[in-house]
């Protein structure tokens, strides 16, 4: 059987989600003038984000709940006071700004250049 197509999952394979996510959060925290420890936030947020993605994949929560609850729980664990209105705004702005950051993993372009012309390449994502 000849391989004709190669499929890539965008996040964590080609696109450096963690780096782009940190940059997007940094931007929106500055936009809303939130004096928050970004390193501590990232440490707390990452496992919470994974937990909510698991619930979403299991169809136990909606995408809107995923986006809101992961932030709300992170802020609560940090004991960082922020209104529900701001959490909703941050959740929305995070998604809007995430695509503005396009850092890829090392050698991504090398691999894609190697495969170009040999295979039909496709990018998929669940985000």
What are these regions (language model features)?
Residues 2-10, 14-105:
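N-terminal helical cap/lid subdomain that shapes the substrate entry/recognition surface
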Residues 89-104, 108-127:
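Substrate-recognition element of Asp-dependent hydrolases with the DxDx(T/V) motif
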Residues 1-3, 117-118:
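A short, charged/proline- and glycine-enriched loop
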């Amino acid at each position: 059987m000849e391989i004709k197509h190669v499929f890539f999952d965008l996040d964590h394979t080609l696109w450096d989600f963690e780096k782009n996510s940190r940059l997007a959060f940094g931007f929106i925290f500055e936009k809303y003038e939130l004096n928050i420890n970004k390193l501590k936030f990232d440490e707390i947020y990452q496992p919470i984000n994974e937990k909510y993605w698991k619930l979403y994949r299991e169809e136990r929560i909606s995408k809107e709940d995923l986006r809101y609850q992961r932030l709300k729980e992170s802020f609560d664990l940090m004991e960082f006071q922020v209104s529900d209105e701001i959490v909703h705004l941050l959740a929305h702005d995070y998604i809007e700004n995430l695509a503005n950051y396009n850092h890829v993993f090392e050698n991504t372009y090398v691999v894609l250049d190697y495969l170009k012309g040999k295979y039909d390449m496709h990018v998929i994502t669940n985000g």
